[in-house]
Amino acid sequence: MSHNTFGHLFRVTTWGESHGPALGCVVDGCPPGVPLTEADIQPWLDRRRPGQGKFVTQRQEPDAVRILSGVFQDERTTAKFGGQVTTGTPISLIIENTDQRSRDYSEIATSFRPGHADYPYFAKYGVRDYRGGGRSSARETAARVAAGAIARKLLPGVTIRGAVVQIGPHAVDPGRIDFSVTGDNPFWAPDPEIVPVWERHLEQVRKAGSSTGAVVAVEATGVPAGWGAPLYGKLDAELAAALMSINAAKGVEIGAGFAAAALSGEENADEMRMGNEGPLFLSNKAGGVLGGISTGQPVTARVAFKPTSSILTPRRSLDEAGREIELRTKGRHDPCVGIRAVPVVEAMVACVLADALLRHRAQTGGGAHVLGENPKS
């Protein structure tokens, strides 16, 4: 199996399966001299950790991370940097799996669960780890969150915040989105008034043994103008690819996204004026990216997640012999996978932006052209 790595200069390779002994990642391209310990990574993993509410999977995993390589500490690093730092070599991270229940999946060893990757994995490789979905499980995203924690260390001036803005048919009013309150409820909701609505909806879904979809919004503020490159290194294209790679993601919008198709040119074009500290945009339909290059506006995106395919309702399917069967999925599953996707979405944005920063420095030296400056003679 190839294609387990993403990024160009800041490269992340994830490894491991849902019911294997461990999973993790290797981060290559992180510059040397960046202070880094497990304590810098663990809080981000704790935000994603399963078993923290009745509307998410009850699998109990501590998600304790260990750094195996790529860091060093002695008297000189302590004196210069204050402790352990990156060395510029590959950083290997490991997270042990401790709460596997593989017996829940014994009945589907030769059957294909509708909506899952079981059949395409079998069609491509001829062999698959059916326990919890193996490599295709959302358990893999723990490694992405760990990598994202390292990426954030390269982005001290950038703030990345995500929120669930829709569960099932119930969406947050865009005018009421407040990212600062997402930590006050179990749904990452940016509007407290939507919480009881989602609770009632999810309770109905859970009791029915079914599932529901969600939309996650993310914004990155503090991204300077100039990151990204035309034509095939567009920042929005890199973001879209990274976000679409997340398990259960079925759609990505940058800025106004598909809504832009219904706008006029006057409505969609973000007008500009000159402010005291540089250009000011009067709107942000572009989502902070024009021509594939950041504008200095907040970079914004939305990701649509499908309903969890593991449901208790019997469904028609096939087995490996081609026989028609009726299948009822067992195991511990999220009735709405989008709820726990917020830290994953944030992490993927962080990795893309860290990569964009390093590529920008490599191409231009990191400088930016400032409006109003006279060219050197």
UniProtKB/Swiss-Prot annotation:
Keyword Kinase in record: no
InterPro entries named in the record: Chorismate_synth (IPR000453), Chorismate_synth_AroC_sf (IPR035904), Chorismate_synthase_CS (IPR020541)
PROSITE patterns membership: CHORISMATE_SYNTHASE_1 (PS00787), CHORISMATE_SYNTHASE_2 (PS00788), CHORISMATE_SYNTHASE_3 (PS00789)
Cofactor note: Reduced FMN (FMNH(2)).
GO biological process terms on file: amino acid biosynthetic process; aromatic amino acid family biosynthetic process; chorismate biosynthetic process
Any one of the GO CC terms: cytosol
Chain sites annotated for binding FMN: R135, S136, S137, N247, A248, G291, K306, P307, T308, S309, S310, R332
Keyword Amino-acid biosynthesis in record: yes
CDD domains for this protein: Chorismate_synthase
Its EC number(s): 4.2.3.5
One Pfam family hit: Chorismate_synt
Pathway: Metabolic intermediate biosynthesis; chorismate biosynthesis; chorismate from D-erythrose 4-phosphate and phosphoenolpyruvate: step 7/7
Domain of life per record: Bacteria
Record's subunit section: Homotetramer.
Protein name: Chorismate synthase
Taxonomic lineage from the root: Bacteria, Pseudomonadati, Pseudomonadota, Alphaproteobacteria, Caulobacterales
